[in-house]
Amino acid sequence: MTQKKNMVTDLNVLFPTIAFILTLFWMFNEELNKSENTIFDAAIYGQSELIKEYVNQGKDMDLQDEFGATLLHYSLQSGHSEISKFLVISEADVNIIDKEGLTPLDWAHWMNQVETAKLIREYGGKTRAELNQ
């Protein structure tokens, strides 16, 4: 009986400790990923002021996520032409490819963003097929 009681006491001490360690780990990972995820979300949801502030602070506008997508890829995919145009004019890499092998110009064509596609072309943008020639 004493042995069983000691085991219960040990578990009562152990579980809060594990929970505390897991909470610290989660908070640390959350803080590490917060800035990158937030900026990609800003491109997806059309938060142009956040994007402009990010770029004006000199941060990497060609940062790629786990899918190889950049702010320009996401703004094109989401139809936020104002952000896309701002990024192109700010000299984002217009020929960077995502993990699907698609360039920003491929996305502009696919999303039928004619004006943005023209601008990307003016800044030297090419399609995947053109890059592979």
Question: What is each PLM-predicted segment?
Answer:
Residues 63-69, 73-83, 89:
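Extracytoplasmic/periplasmic/luminal assembly and interaction segments
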Residues 93, 98-113:
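A generic tandem-repeat structural signature
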Residues 41-47, 74-80, 107-113:
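Ankyrin repeat A-helix N-terminal signature
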Residues 65, 98, 131-132:
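Ankyrin repeat boundary/linker residues
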Residues 2-3, 10-41, 114-133:
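Ankyrin-repeat-protein effector appendages
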Residues 47-55, 80-89, 113-122:
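Ankyrin repeat structural motif
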